[in-house]
From Swiss-Prot:
It comes from Influenza B virus (strain B/Singapore/222/1979). Disulfide bonds join C87-C420, C122-C127, C182-C229, C231-C236, C277-C291, C279-C289, C318-C337, C424-C447. Residues 89-466 are annotated as: Head of neuraminidase. Glycans are attached at N56, N64, N144, N284. The gene is NA. This is Neuraminidase. The influenza B genome consist of 8 RNA segments. Genetic variation of hemagglutinin and/or neuraminidase genes results in the emergence of new influenza strains. The mechanism of variation can be the result of point mutations or the result of genetic reassortment between segments of two different strains.
Amino acid sequence: MLPSTIQTLTLFLTSGGVLLSLYVSASLSYLLYSDILLKFSPTKRTAPTMSLDCANVSNVQAVNRSATKEMTFLLPEPEWTYPRLSCQGSTFQKALLISPHRFGEARGNSAPLIIREPFIACGPKECKHFALTHYAAQPGGYYNGTRKDRNKLRHLISVKLGKIPTVENSIFHMAAWSGSACHDGREWTYIGVDGPDSNALIKIKYGEAYTDTYHSYANNILRTQESACNCIGGDCYLMITDGSASGISKCRFLKIREGRIIKEIFPTGRVEHTEECTCGFASNKTIECACRDNSYTAKRPFVKLNVETDTAEIRLMCTETYLDTPRPDDGSITGPCESNGDKGLGGIKGGFVHQRMASKIGRWYSRTMSKTERMGMELYVKYDGDPWTDSEALAPSGVMVSMKEPGWYSFGFEIKDKKCDVPCIGIEMVHDGGKETWHSAATAIYCLMGSGQLLWDTVTGVDMAL
């Protein structure tokens, strides 16, 4: 008896009394990736029916005039993604600039879209550059209103990372004035929020299908994180918030699987105001987020979400390096870690990404160089420790955007190499033309690579007067 791992296929073709036997043997093996067994699904292939118009031959008693054969092959399904150790490196370097409006003289399909709130998310095989467009291009006649955060024309769009977000290159995913996206290893999940301020709606798209919604719970600008959501083992976690920009705004997390919400997570702890979180995996067990408090403090609310228990807790970062803008002088806030201090009204989304190593963990952050304006962007790092209790200053690691250039929202993401993940930080560099002209953004990207010092800052190269 043949072993079960060997399949023998015998195909008999009879034509003119000639017998042909073809033997095909195939062996199956189990593949291991990150200690996770790959899953296989049976896929049937049926050979087509073929008519055999053969002449009668005297020494052939019977001729099969048709032949069919059903064969079953086992094909591997794409695997869910899990966080891995970071690729080796000790410093970030300038990786890429996407400055669409350097091509502002182009017209028609080659014209750059007017965008804001860019972010990047990566799957196993590609990264996508997302943004929220005003459904307008530059040059064009629809500049009025492109400085507004919310309107009926805004859409979540994407291009392959490295492409310029032009009319022709961009994929329009859904109507949205707030957005997120992530890849679970098998498919993309897209998140878009739009609707009136008092009754906004979260919409979820999985691949090409619109799959689920989530309604406003505080009736005050339901919104999401403006950066990538985070997936592990097929479950994707999305931060949302709903509430006043200058008062209470309590966040939640949605657990999403294949485009459908399967659980709501209600954080505990310091929950007064949490929005625009930038999140990533500290380990296979914990998602951490550095967020924005637009009402009470210049310290960042810091979330720890346990993906095994689906519980989350929020406390303020204790470091004397305050990461929001505007902010007071570093170290000037007295009292316990939960003290708000002054200059807490207003804020900005901040960059944050993990460097996972075998023996320690690095947490990289970005903040504007100006304490009062959205100008410049500097990189900081802290190895090990607990952001909730460590009061020491973060270590400065280089200037990504000088004080002469705009530094607005920033975000973190990870590029998947073959055996490790590359941590990166992206920076939104806004061309702020005021209310009378176009208002759009470039994106600067810095990634962990090599050693030494961060060498060079980024400029957009755009003159709005041209």
